[in-house]
Structures are given as C-alpha cells and as structure tokens.
Design a protein with these regions (language model features):
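Acidic, metal/ion-coordinating pockets
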Residues: 2-306
Length: 307
C-alpha cells in the first residue's frame, strides 16, 4: 500500500508543470492556457463477459460493476470532458453464462454501444476458437489492435491492426496492442497457426515508428502481458523497463487492482506509467492529461469504482 501511495504521489506530480505555472506572469499564463489541450483516457481490462452487476450475495463484489452502470459513468465523463478515448486491454470473453450461450456477441455489441475506441486481445478471447473470434470481433465497430500476433496463416489474417492513431485537437495519440504468449496457456486448436512475436522487440519497433515516423505526441500500449511476475516472464513492468517511446501501458491479464498508475523508468530514465483496474468491470480506469505544444505537462490517474 505504501508503494502504491508513493507512486500515486509521483503520478500526481508528473513533470510538475502545473505546480509552477502559478508563478508565471498573468499575460503569459493566459497564452499558455490558450495552448493547453486536455485529454481523458478511460480503460477497462478482463471484463470477462460480466454484463450484469455482481449479485447481492454478501460477497466482496456484491452489487458492483455492470455494463449499464459503466455506460452511465462513461457518458457522464464525456459530458464533462471534451476529448475522451476509451480502450480495453483484453479478455472481453469468458466468465459468465453470456459467453457460454452467445460466444461473445453481447459483449462486443455492448462495447459498440459504449463507444470504445480500440481494444486488444486477451488469452480468453480465444476460448471459443479462432473462428469464433472472426465471427464476434467482426461485429466490432472499434479496431482490434495487436502488434505481436502474426495471423497470416489463419482466418484472422487481415482482421486486426498493429496500431491506430487518434487525433484530438491536434494531439496525436498512437495506440498499439501486445498479447501474451499463447503456447502453454491457450489450447493449440484454439489459436492454430498464430505466431507469437517477441513483445519487447515488437514494442520497441512499434513505439519508435509511432513516435518518429507517425509523429505521435503520446504513445499508449494496450497490453495483455500481465502486470508483474516473480520470474523473468515478460510483463508490463519488464516491457516498460526494456523499451523506449512508450508513455503509458494499459494492462490486463493478472487482474491487478491499482489505485493509481505506477511508474517504471525506461532505459533513458523516463517514467513509463502502468495502470490496471482489476477485473469484471468493477472499476473504470481514468487518466487525465494536459498537453502544451504537443507535450504532456501534467497528469493525474485513478481507478473509479463502477457502482
């Protein structure tokens, strides 16, 4: 808890510009404020087909979550904020009878209604088989981003993108996806000839392309690698420490509850912020950024309970 509190304080003071701007002359302040652009990032992970709130059974999650409440919360934030992006970090499928009966269709259609901007692939999204992924994700109104799965020899070929660029008031946000190693985790007959590519190498290459070639001001990775492990398995923490040009990792897979994003320095000593908000749609991640002249000058983040 102390570590989380420390990271929260770090995050709230990210680049500290907002704290010193009050010392600037009034005329300069007015000019700076005119240039400032705000952007709110909302995100979910590991919703696992939880369309309804948890039942009122006395459990620790009783009454929490539910797609209707999430929709209301997202709508409220969009009414309050001009520039909003909404992402998911994978494992949309599996976990309730909705998936058993309908194989993911209600989940995808619900995300369409909520206006998701993009998502990535989790291991449980293969649970109905790769043919089912084609059927269900083919109904999505949002792009499925995955840079380190090569689907060339499968029916998913051409149905995903490695990255997508979003522009909000001149701010270019590059977003890409990374998935977990399927071997040993997903049945072979579910992912078939999908090839897994090294997430560190792909992450470095994709982030560099977004930053240098696509001139993105902010780079986000939607990751289903998992937050952190006790061994050398590639996780979000490892990804942050071994890559450059990534500003924010929105994670999934390990169902990690973070009160606020945590920072891991990259090889250049720059902080990479990592966030994950548990599972089942209990929480909605929220990160508020302020940009001036194409650079993020301040940032706050939190986990918002859906209730």
């Amino acid at each position: 808890m102390d570590a989380l509190s420390s990271n929260r304080r770090q995050f709230l003071k990210f680049l500290g510009t907002a704290a010193v701007i009050g010392t600037v002359a009034p005329d300069t302040l007015a000019v700076d404020q005119a240039k400032a652009t705000s952007l709110t990032i909302l995100h979910t992970n590991d919703v696992h087909s939880r369309l309804d709130p948890f039942p009122m059974d006395g459990g620790r999650n009783a009454g929490k979550g539910g797609i209707a409440r999430r929709a209301t919360l997202i709508k409220q934030i969009r009414q309050e904020q001009k520039n909003v992006l909404l992402f998911d970090a994978g494992d949309v499928f599996q976990g309730t009878p909705y998936f058993n009966l309908y194989k993911g269709e209600p989940e995808v259609l619900a995300m369409n209604r909520l206006g998701y901007d993009a998502g990535t692939i989790g291991n449980h999204d293969f649970d109905g088989g790769i043919d089912n992924m084609v059927t269900q994700f083919g109904k999505a109104s949002w792009p499925l981003l995955i840079a380190n799965y090569d689907f060339k020899n499968t029916v998913m070929d051409g149905r995903t993108k490695p990255y997508r660029i979003f522009e909000k008031e001149g701010i270019r946000v590059g977003v890409f996806g990374l998935g977990i190693q399927p071997e040993g985790l997903i049945p072979k007959d579910a992912y078939k000839e999908t090839k897994y590519l090294d997430p560190i190498e792909v992450g470095n290459d994709t982030a560099a392309k977004l930053r240098s070639e696509q001139h993105c001001d902010y780079v986000i990775c939607l990751s289903h690698l998992g937050f952190k492990y006790d061994d050398a398995t590639v996780s979000d923490n490892v990804l942050a420490a071994k890559t450059r040009n990534i500003d924010l990792i929105i994670g999934g897979h390990t169902h990690t509850f973070l009160d606020a994003p945590v920072a891991v320095n990259n090889p250049d000593g720059q902080p990479v912020w990592i966030n994950q908000v548990g599972f089942a749609g209990i929480n909605l991640g929220r990160i508020d950024l302020t940009f001036e002249q194409g650079k993020a000058i301040s940032s706050t983040g939190k986990s918002v309970e859906v209730k």
